[in-house]
From Swiss-Prot:
Its main location: membrane. Part of the signal recognition particle protein translocation system, which is composed of SRP and FtsY. GO terms for biological process: protein targeting; SRP-dependent cotranslational protein targeting to membrane. The gene is ftsY. The lineage of its organism: Archaea, Methanobacteriati, Methanobacteriota, Methanomada group, Methanococci. It catalyses: GTP + H2O = GDP + phosphate + H(+). This is Signal recognition particle receptor FtsY. HAMAP family: FtsY. It comes from Methanocaldococcus jannaschii (strain ATCC 43067 / DSM 2661 / JAL-1 / JCM 10045 / NBRC 100440).
Length: 409
């Protein structure tokens, strides 16, 4: 996930660090750090049998027993001999130094010989390289420009003294620049559901996007997540245009354990969703998740239809579902849907297969709306809440995420 983007960001931080070291005429120094000692001072002079010595004695005992009874070496004896050999090899490898025994470690680090003030010209070439790399990673141009500006704001004019940790300063500067891009105002879907429930009405969420992004599957994933949290859910088969769309949603609903409200293929999408809302009101169901036909923004008739859906059903949220693998195309699509129906948030799918990370970095900033969830696999549980801090940690290799290869659909 985001491998190329991660590599370039870390490389940028490293190059800026080296620029600062060069300007500050940094020199390498050895330092000794005291860590929590694993042994007490008195134990240094106390003769106690070591674990490997005890193991060695036991192994030698096995060999002696075999010789006394004058039998052929058993498997156990052969294992004992092998164990003695391994212990000797380990002892050769583990040469404990004076520093090790006192819990001290020695490291080489660079220290500035003089104070440095970072100028724009000092880091300009590094940022130009980053700009090209980000564009190649499908990051939107306006986002690239903003990110470069953010890094400059973090670093240019900053004074760095010999006592400062240069690596920490540069990595934090890039992190903060990224976080600024990712931090859009959050939407708490659960809070909306709870508020509406207290008022005795369902929460209505309409999903929009083009074909092939995983919109219908995402609806099923969110239904599963909400059901796991104790909310009742009904699905509205508002995609009456695509062949097999209703059947696909029905199968997902069966797997997840929720009901679907549907009409015949070709029916009015707004009417289907309206009926689902009335059904939810009559039965006290908490949430209506409404599918709609995938459509290109250039298809005027279908875009007019989605405007009608939003106008008639008055949803609490309109969520755009985009494919992370399409990079800048996902950003363009989100912008078009936002112009048409004023979307409230974004769900990005197929993020587990996204090596570039351009869409994830760009889409929220480009339209000024938050990413709500990320689709990260092919199980109903593979929908995770988006968090800017988590994304930054992921981009800088500070947190790994285990993806499942299992498939449920």
């Amino acid at each position: 996930m985001f491998g190329k983007l991660k590599e370039k960001l870390l490389e940028t931080a490293s190059k800026i660090t080296e620029k600062i070291y060069s300007k500050g005429e940094a020199e390498e120094v050895k330092e000794e750090k005291e860590e929590k000692s694993k042994i007490s001072f008195t134990s240094l002079f106390k003769k106690e049998p070591k674990k490997e010595e005890v193991k060695k004695e036991k192994a030698e005992e096995e060999i002696k027993k075999s010789e006394i009874v004058k039998t052929e070496p058993s498997e156990k004896v052969e294992e004992a001999k092998e164990e003695i050999k391994e212990i000797k090899e380990e002892k050769e490898e583990k040469k404990i130094t004076f520093f090790d025994r006192f819990g001290l470690t020695r490291a080489i680090k660079k220290v500035l010989k003089k104070e440095v003030v970072i100028l724009e010209e000092d880091i300009e070439d590094v940022l130009e390289e980053l700009e090209i790399a980000l564009l190649e990673a499908d990051v939107a141009l306006e986002v690239v420009e903003k990110l470069i500006e953010n890094i400059k704001n973090e670093l240019v004019g900053r004074k760095i003294s010999p006592d400062d940790n240069v690596e920490e300063i540069t990595i934090n500067a890039v992190k903060n620049a990224i976080k600024n891009i990712l931090s859009q105002e959050k939407i708490d879907i659960e809070e909306i559901i709870k508020k509406n429930k207290a008022e005795g009405k369902p929460t209505v969420i309409v999903f929009v996007g083009i074909n092939g992004t995983g919109k219908t599957t995402t609806i099923a994933k969110l239904a599963y997540k909400l059901k796991q949290k104790g909310y009742s859910v009904v699905l509205a088969a508002g995609d009456t245009f695509r062949a097999g769309a209703i059947e696909q949603l029905e199968q997902h609903a069966k797997n997840v354990g929720v009901k679907v409200i549907k009409h015949k293929p070709g029916a009015d999408s707004a009417a289907v969703i309206y009926d689902a809302i009335q059904h939810a009101k009559a039965r006290g169901i908490d949430v209506v998740l409404a599918d709609t036909a995938g459509r290109q923004a250039t298809n005027v008739n279908l875009m007019e239809e989605i405007k009608k859906v939003v106008r008639v059903t008055k949803p609490d949220l309109v969520i755009f579902v985009g494919d992370a693998l399409t990079g800048n195309d996902a950003v363009y699509q989100a912008e078009e849907f936002n112009r048409a129906v004023n979307i409230d948030g974004i769900i990005l799918t197929k993020v587990d297969a996204d090596a570039k990370g351009g869409a994830a970095l760009s889409i929220g900033y480009a339209i000024g709306k938050p990413i709500l969830y990320l689709g990260v696999g092919q199980r109903y549980q593979d929908l995770i809440e988006f968090d800017a801090d988590w994304m930054v940690r992921k981009l800088f290799g500070e947190e790994e995420f285990e993806f499942s290869t299992e498939r449920e659909f």
